[in-house]
Amino acid sequence: MHAHPYPDGPRLLADIGGTNARFALEYASGKIINAKTLACADFASLTLAVQAYLNRWSCGGIRHAIVAIANPVTGDSVKMTNHHWEFSIEATRSELKFDTLLVVNDFAALAMAVPMLRDDEFEQIGGGTAVTEGVIGVLGAGTGLGIAGLMFVDSRWLAIESEGGHVAFSPSDERELAVLQYCWQRYDHVSAERLVSGPGIALIHEALAAQQTPHPAALSTAAIVARAMSRADPLCQETIECFCGMLGTVAANLAVTLCTKGGIYIGGGIVPRLGGYFATSPFRSRFESKGRFSSFNAQIPTSVITAPFPAFPGAAAILADYLDSKTSNPFAVRRAGHESSTGASLPR
C-alpha cells in the first residue's frame, strides 16, 4: 500500500546538535526524503540554516515543521547549551511563515524512533533479551551527552525528556578518578557530559597524557579516534577504552534508574562510528558490573543504533500526533513530572 502525500504539502524535519544541523522532508506518512547535513558553524542562526536547506531543494510553502534540538525546551525561548544559537520559537515560526513549528528535545525524538527501527538499523552488543513493552533507555555521545527514556502507556509510546548528561561524573576505577582529579583543576563541576562526549574524548586524552613524561601532544577527537581504531597509538587506544568504560557506567546507571527492561539504545555521533571496536571495548562488561544489580543489568540488551538519520521518524511521529490531536502541549512528548502531554502512537 502506497502512502498518500500530505494534502497540505511536505513537512520539514530537523535534528539540531551542537555541531551538525540535519534536515529532511516527509512528504507522506513514513516517507522521508532529501536528508541533508549542514554544519551549524556555517550559519549565524537556525532560521538561516533552515532557509539554506529549503532553498537547496527549491521547497517553498512548508506549513508544518518540527525541530529536535540538543537542549532542554521549557518555553518559547531556546538557548543552545553547546552552540551559540538562541531563538524564540514563535518568532522563528513567524519569520519562516510556518503554520506549525514544534521544538522538542533531540533525544526525546530519538527515543520515539526506537520502536520503528528495523532489525538492520541497530546492532546488539552483548547478551540480554528485551521485555516487550518494557521501559527503554536511550543515550548517545556527540558534541554533548543525550539521555532519554521511553514508556509504553495506554497503548502508546511516551518519551521522557532528560538532561541526564549533566549529572555529576562518577569514576569507577583509579584511572577514571585520576582523570576526574585532573578535570577538577579546571572545572568546579565535572558532569558526565564533560567526559562522555566528543570534546570529552580530547579531555580524557589530555588527562591521561598529563601522567606521562614527556607529555604527548594534544590531539583532536577525530585524530584520537582514528589512531585508536588503527591501533597505531597506545595512548589513543587507552583513551577510547576509558571513554567506552565511562559510557558503560552512564548506561548502567540509566538502566537501574528507569528499570529499562526494554533495552538500552545508543545513538549520537561517536559510538556508531567506532563499529567493531566498540563491540570489544569495556562498555558491556562495565554495564554489567553493577554490584548487587549485576544480574539485573546482564538481562538487559544494549544496542547501537546504526540508522543514518535515526531521529527523523521519531520527530515525524511527534509532529503527526500533534497535528492529528491539536493538543495544547506544544512539545508533544511526556516530560518527567509533567502530566499534561501526549505521545505518538507507534508500532510495537
Question: What spans do the regions from the language model cover?
Answer:
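Active-site metal-binding loops of divalent metal-dependent hydrolases
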Residues: 107, 143, 269-270
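Glycine-rich phosphate-binding loop of actin/hexokinase-like ATP-binding domains
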Residues: 124-192, 275-276, 282-288, 292-297
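Short, glycine/charged-enriched secondary-structure capping and boundary segments
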Residues: 27-28, 80-83, 117-119, 152-155, ...
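Short, acidic Gly/Pro/Ser/Thr-rich loop/turn segments
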Residues: 21, 72-74, 144-148, 203, ...
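ATP-dependent carbohydrate kinase catalytic cores
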Residues: 100-131, 222-234, 238-244, 249
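ATP-binding/phosphotransfer module of carbohydrate and carboxylate kinases, centering on a glycine-rich
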Residues: 1-56, 60, 178-348
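Short glycine-aspartate micro-motif
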Residues: 11-15, 62-66, 102, 128, ...
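Short beta-strand-loop/turn "lid" adjacent to the catalytic site in phosphate-handling enzymes
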Residues: 57-103, 108-121, 138, 273-276
